[in-house]
Swiss-Prot record:
The keyword Membrane applies. This is Phosphatidylglycerol--prolipoprotein diacylglyceryl transferase. Catalyzes the transfer of the diacylglyceryl group from phosphatidylglycerol to the sulfhydryl group of the N-terminal cysteine of a prolipoprotein, the first step in the formation of mature lipoproteins. It comes from Chlamydia trachomatis serovar D (strain ATCC VR-885 / DSM 19411 / UW-3/Cx). The gene is lgt. One of its GO terms (cellular component) is plasma membrane. The keyword Cell membrane applies.
Length: 272
């Protein structure tokens, strides 16, 4: 068994009142690595030198906007689906994201919305920047961000797993007591990374064409399935559904993603 009681703070500068948390650093690093990978993939597949320069600049701008969209969307979704009545009674707490509380489903929705807005603003200059192209690119490179965010959850001792007798069980004293639990944060994060690496490789080799919709669809379905399965190893989350419910709020939110992914594949296949 592993006893995990790491401080949430990675670096602290008390004289200036600055405290850098593991979660914040890992979140930022994950977004940076995924953005870097996306720009690298897109420019590698672009053959025109001038177009490649414009594409790089445009995607860098997209990444900056996506970071803000993810934070806002993930926070609002958490407030709506997991916060119960707490945030309605204490609205000032909504902006306090440093206390924790982000929803991956909200992050997905916000990125898609931002992709649609960004595409509308830039598609005349770069016709390749369709909503489908941007979403395909995001689907192929989201893994680094997803993994490191879940590692941040692990460091924070949050999103705890169910009790286990397996040798890799982890004891989280801050919230989990002295009971060994599944490190479900790492299960889920590694699943996302593997899925993303597969999609990245398929796009890079030309098996999946960016803009076809298949990468985005594969990511939606894969993420939903991984999340759905991971929920069975998590302790109860959310205030709207009680523990007596067959499915968790995370599983209910994952089901539409599967249908959406299948729908995108069906539409894409009709265009061939």
């Amino acid at each position: 068994m592993i006893h995990w009681d790491q401080s949430r703070t990675l670096l602290s500068f008390p004289r200036v009142g600055l405290h850098l948390s593991w979660y914040g650093i890992l979140f930022s690093l994950g977004i940076f690595l995924s953005s870097f990978s996306g720009i690298k993939l897109a420019t590698a597949l672009c053959k025109d030198r001038e177009e490649k320069k414009e594409l790089r600049t445009s995607l860098e701008n997209f990444a900056l906007g996506a970071l803000l969209a993810i934070i806002i969307g993930a926070r609002l979704a958490y407030v709506l689906f997991y916060g119960g009545s707490f945030y309605f009674e204490n609205p000032s707490e909504i902006i306090k994201i440093w206390k924790g509380g982000l929803s991956s489903h909200g992050a997905v929705i916000s990125v898609v919305i931002w992709a649609a807005v960004f595409s509308r603003l830039h598609i005349r200059k770069l016709p390749m920047l369709s909503v489908t192209y941007i979403c395909d690119l995001c689907g192929a490179v989201f893994g680094c961000a997803a993994l490191l965010i879940r590692v941040g959850n692990f460091m924070n001792q949050e999103i705890l797993g169910t009790p286990t007798s397996m040798p890799w069980g982890v004891i989280f004293p801050n919230g989990g007591g002295q009971i060994p639990r599944h490190p479900v944060q790492l299960y889920e994060g590694l699943g996302y990374l593997v899925l993303s690496c597969i999609l990245y490789r398929l796009c890079y080799r030309g098996v999946i064409r960016l803009g076809s919709g298949y990468s985005a669809a594969g990511a939606l379905i894969g993420v939903a399935v991984i999340r759905f399965c991971a929920e069975f190893f998590k302790t109860h989350q959310g205030a709207w559904l009680g523990e007596e419910n067959i499915l968790t709020i995370g599983q209910w939110l994952s089901i539409p993603m599967i249908f959406l992914g299948v729908g995108i594949i069906w539409i894409a296949s009709k265009k061939k």
